[in-house]
């Protein structure tokens, strides 16, 4: 079996080498000749998989993309050819959820306004929104969900309207895809009217797509309302954010909320699982075994007395302030936004930090938050 894979996908050799010959290629410049005798093709979103690439590739039976979306795959053509295709939905969901939770703790610390006791509204209850909800519920924070599409699909969770969520919530975090059509378009979902409707001292976080918020309107509203606190990981007009918006934002990063080492590795691992299922073989490797340890030792926390202590624990895994500072220094440089993303040192997720003897203790809720427990 010949496996052709994008050279920027991690752990391909470790996961797939036992199955056959692995050839790593540049996904941006991949040619038909490189794929011609492949049985398996593993790509990222930079590779367009269509007839022009695969015509004449008679051996190919499996295409996997280590991405959330599939818009770079010609699904009709692959179906016509009988080529199995899959992707990695939700591979970065934990990273995005933890980023948003982390940002809330940073705001709470900076403005002496505790997260505990607030009501957090999550707009978009798919993979990333649900990951955030898991963090918040582990910490004992009340959440409200808005997702009309999931509500209509029969999702049994309780949902509220967007206007009700805006009225009732102290914190609002956005986790929707960008859509311009249909019954519930999300383009400029938060326009000037909705931004003006935000309650006093609201925290607004956007970790999905920049154009879900009208950034020009956001500038106007924020200039009049210093009470609003903003966390933006995504920007209208990326990779060129509106320069007058950045100084108005409390936490600013270059679309890296989903950039964790675990998330990147999870994308590759999900394709490995799918291929093993197609081959009718048992999965004999684990994601955890691939990842390097965060530290060589473990922590044994006896208590987490307040949010300051919790934030200190979170910062041991990822200090959001570093990315915020770098973004402010470089976002106006030519290609600075893209270079920050390309050269980003993928952070770790909470699970990388091992906590000893926490089960049944006063801090066992940290396991629900996502930290790993040993000596249970």
From Swiss-Prot:
Molecular function via GO: 4-phosphoerythronate dehydrogenase activity; NAD binding; protein dimerization activity
A GO cellular component entry from the record: cytosol
Chief place of localization: cytoplasm
Pathway connected to this protein: Cofactor biosynthesis; pyridoxine 5'-phosphate biosynthesis; pyridoxine 5'-phosphate from D-erythrose 4-phosphate: step 2/5
Reaction(s) this enzyme catalyzes, per UniProt: 4-phospho-D-erythronate + NAD(+) = (R)-3-hydroxy-2-oxo-4-phosphooxybutanoate + NADH + H(+)
Enzyme class: oxidoreductase
Active site positions: 209, 238, 255 (proton donor)
Annotated EC: 1.1.1.290
Residues that hold NAD(+) according to the record: 147, 233, 258
Subcellular location: Cytoplasm
Residues given in the record as substrate binding sites: 45, 67, 259
Entry-linked Gene3D superfamilies: 3.30.1370.170, NAD(P)-binding Rossmann-like Domain (3.40.50.720)
GO biological process: 'de novo' pyridoxal 5'-phosphate biosynthetic process; pyridoxine biosynthetic process
Pfam families the record matches: 2-Hacid_dh, 2-Hacid_dh_C, DUF3410
Annotated keywords: Cytoplasm, NAD, Oxidoreductase, Pyridoxine biosynthesis
Chain segments annotated as transmembrane: none
Function recorded in the entry: Catalyzes the oxidation of erythronate-4-phosphate to 3-hydroxy-2-oxo-4-phosphonooxybutanoate.
Subunit structure: Homodimer.
Similarity annotation: Belongs to the D-isomer specific 2-hydroxyacid dehydrogenase family. PdxB subfamily.
Name of the protein in its database record: Erythronate-4-phosphate dehydrogenase
Annotated organism of origin: Shewanella loihica (strain ATCC BAA-1088 / PV-4)
Protein encoded by which gene: pdxB
């Amino acid at each position: 079996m010949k496996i052709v894979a994008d050279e920027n996908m991690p752990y391909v050799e470790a996961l797939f080498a036992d199955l056959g010959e692995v050839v790593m290629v540049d996904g941006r410049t991949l040619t038909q000749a490189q794929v011609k005798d492949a049985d398996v093709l593993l790509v990222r979103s930079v590779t367009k998989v269509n007839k022009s690439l695969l015509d004449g590739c008679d051996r190919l039976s499996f295409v996997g993309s280590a991405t959330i979306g599939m818009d770079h795959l010609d699904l009709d053509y692959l179906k016509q050819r009988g080529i199995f295709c899959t992707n990695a939905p939700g591979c970065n969901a934990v990273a995005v959820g933890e980023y948003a939770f982390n940002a809330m703790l940073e705001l709470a610390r900076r403005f002496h306004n505790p997260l505990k006791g607030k009501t957090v509204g999550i707009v978009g209850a798919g993979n990333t929104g649900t990951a955030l909800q898991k963090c918040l519920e582990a910490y004992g924070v009340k959440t409200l969900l808005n997702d009309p599409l999931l509500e209509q699909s029969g999702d049994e969770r309780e949902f509220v309207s967007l206007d009700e969520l805006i009225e009732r919530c102290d914190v609002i975090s956005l986790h929707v895809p960008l859509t311009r059509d249909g019954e519930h378009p999300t383009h400029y979902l938060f326009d000037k009217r909705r931004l003006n409707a935000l309650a006093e001292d609201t925290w607004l976080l956007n970790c999905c797509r920049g154009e879900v918020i009208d950034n020009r309107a956001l500038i106007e509203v924020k200039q009049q309302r210093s009470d609003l606190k903003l966390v933006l990981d995504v920007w209208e007009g990326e990779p060129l954010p509106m320069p007058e918006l950045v100084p108005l934002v409390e936490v600013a990063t270059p679309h890296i909320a989903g950039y964790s080492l675990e998330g990147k590795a999870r994308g590759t691992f999900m394709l490995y699982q799918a291929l093993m299922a197609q081959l009718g073989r048992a999965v004999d490797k684990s994601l955890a075994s691939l990842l390097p340890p965060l530290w060589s030792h473990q922590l044994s926390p006896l208590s987490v007395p307040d949010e300051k202590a919790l934030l200190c624990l979170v910062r041991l895994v990822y200090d959001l302030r570093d990315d915020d500072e770098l973004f402010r220094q470089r976002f106006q440089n030519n290609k600075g936004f893209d270079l920050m993303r390309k050269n980003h040192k993928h952070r770790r997720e909470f699970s990388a930090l091992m906590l000893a003897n926490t089960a049944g203790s006063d801090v066992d809720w940290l396991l629900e938050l996502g930290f790993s427990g040993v000596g249970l």
